[in-house]
């Protein structure tokens, strides 16, 4: 009969090599994934920093009736940078999402996949939080610009309600603000100049909000759909922690009871052995 030991050993070694190769490839893939996670996190942090800088620029512009062009240009650069970075983040998160969906479609389930899903959900939520803050900052600035326009109109003797002013802003026609204003004083001219400046700022803001609207809604819907999954994960983790704590407590109790039982057993043995020794000694003495 032919000895196939060497052949089987070679086949086993080949299988082991394949397993090692798969493990190495998987580890390399996860390393690259975590590098991507750090890159995305860095982009989100950059957006957050830019949003804070945007707030400072808003305050500087509102503090001056006629802000300098340099400050306005810096604000536009910040807004453009936020838009570019946000699009990068969205693209990378979409890529991760598609990769996860592809694996789920093949009914694959692993610890690595769960890690990637959790990281993706965390980054998506953080991204939406930052962009929500940016959106709130823009909306707040729009309201403050609108308030300044309303005050300047009052200076010229023209009173408007909030609804009327909103209609004027939505018309997109700056000439509508000059309607009915008597331009016979420097105060009226200065007021109209500031009105035009604030109106221009509002138009830029609305364009920026419009450009980011679709992306923001897309990411917000994604996070909302993930919310239930995240809540489930958190629920399971909390219950797992409770279970572990109970298990530790039960183990300590078991050890305590076991220790007491062991002491009782030793005491019983001692109680049995000592009389035995006494009896043996007595009997030995009698026979002696």
UniProtKB/Swiss-Prot annotation:
Its main location: membrane. The keyword Translocase does not apply. The keyword Transferase does not apply. It is found in: Cytoplasmic vesicle, Secretory vesicle, Synaptic vesicle membrane; Cell membrane; Synapse, Synaptosome. SMART domains: SynN (SM00503), t_SNARE (SM00397). InterPro entries: SNARE, Syntaxin, Syntaxin/epimorphin_CS, Syntaxin_N, T_SNARE_dom. Part of the SNARE core complex containing SNAP25, VAMP2 and STX1A; this complex constitutes the basic catalytic machinery of the complex neurotransmitter release apparatus. The SNARE complex interacts with CPLX1. Interacts with STXBP1. The interaction with STXBP1 promotes assembly of the SNARE complex. Interacts (via C-terminus) with KCNB1 (via C-terminus); the interaction increases in a calcium-dependent manner and induces a pore-independent enhancement of exocytosis in neuroendocrine cells, chromaffin cells, pancreatic beta cells and from the soma of dorsal root ganglia (DRG) neurons. Residues 1-265 are cytoplasmic. The chain crosses the membrane at residues 266-286. It comes from Pongo abelii. One of its GO terms (biological process) is vesicle docking. It holds the Pfam family SNARE. Plays an essential role in hormone and neurotransmitter calcium-dependent exocytosis and endocytosis. Part of the SNARE (Soluble NSF Attachment Receptor) complex composed of SNAP25, STX1A and VAMP2 which mediates the fusion of synaptic vesicles with the presynaptic plasma membrane. STX1A and SNAP25 are localized on the plasma membrane while VAMP2 resides in synaptic vesicles. The pairing of the three SNAREs from the N-terminal SNARE motifs to the C-terminal anchors leads to the formation of the SNARE complex, which brings membranes into close proximity and results in final fusion. Belongs to the syntaxin family. It is a single-pass type IV membrane protein. Keywords: Cell membrane, Coiled coil, Cytoplasmic vesicle, Exocytosis, Isopeptide bond, Membrane, Neurotransmitter transport, Phosphoprotein, Synapse, Synaptosome, Transmembrane, Transmembrane helix, Transport, Ubl conjugation. Residues 68-109 form a coiled coil. GO terms for cellular component: neuron projection; plasma membrane; SNARE complex; synaptic vesicle membrane. Residues 192-254 form the t-SNARE coiled-coil homology domain. The modification Phosphoserine is found at residues 14, 64, 95, 188. This is Syntaxin-1A. Residues 287-288 are extracellular.
């Amino acid at each position: 009969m032919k000895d196939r030991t060497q052949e089987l050993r070679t086949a086993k070694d080949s299988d082991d090599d394949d397993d090692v190769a798969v493990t190495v490839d998987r580890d390399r893939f996860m390393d690259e994934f975590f590098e991507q996670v750090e890159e995305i996190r860095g982009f989100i942090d950059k957006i957050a920093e830019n949003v804070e800088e945007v707030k400072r620029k808003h305050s500087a512009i509102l503090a001056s009736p006629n802000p300098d062009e340099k400050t306005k240009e810096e604000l536009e650069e910040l807004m453009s940078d936020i838009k570019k970075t946000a699009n990068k983040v969205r693209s990378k998160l979409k890529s991760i999402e598609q990769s996860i969906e592809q694996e789920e479609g093949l009914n694959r389930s692993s610890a690595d996949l769960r890690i990637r899903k959790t990281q993706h959900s965390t980054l998506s939520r953080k991204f939406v939080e930052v962009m929500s803050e940016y959106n709130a900052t823009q909306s707040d600035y729009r309201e403050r610009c609108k308030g300044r326009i309303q005050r300047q109109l009052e200076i010229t003797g023209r009173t408007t309600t909030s609804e009327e002013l909103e209609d004027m802003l939505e018309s997109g026609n700056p000439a509508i603000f000059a309607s009915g204003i008597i331009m016979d004083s420097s105060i009226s001219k200065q007021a109209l100049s500031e009105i035009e400046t604030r109106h221009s700022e509002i138009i830029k803001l609305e364009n920026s909000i419009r450009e980011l609207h679709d992306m923001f809604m897309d990411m917000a819907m994604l996070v909302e759909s993930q919310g239930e999954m995240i809540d489930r994960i958190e629920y399971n983790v909390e219950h797992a922690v409770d279970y572990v704590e109970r298990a530790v407590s039960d183990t300590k109790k078991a050890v305590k009871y076991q220790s007491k039982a062991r002491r009782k057993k030793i005491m019983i043995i001692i109680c049995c052995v000592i009389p035995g020794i006494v009896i043996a000694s007595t009997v030995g003495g009698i026979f002696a």
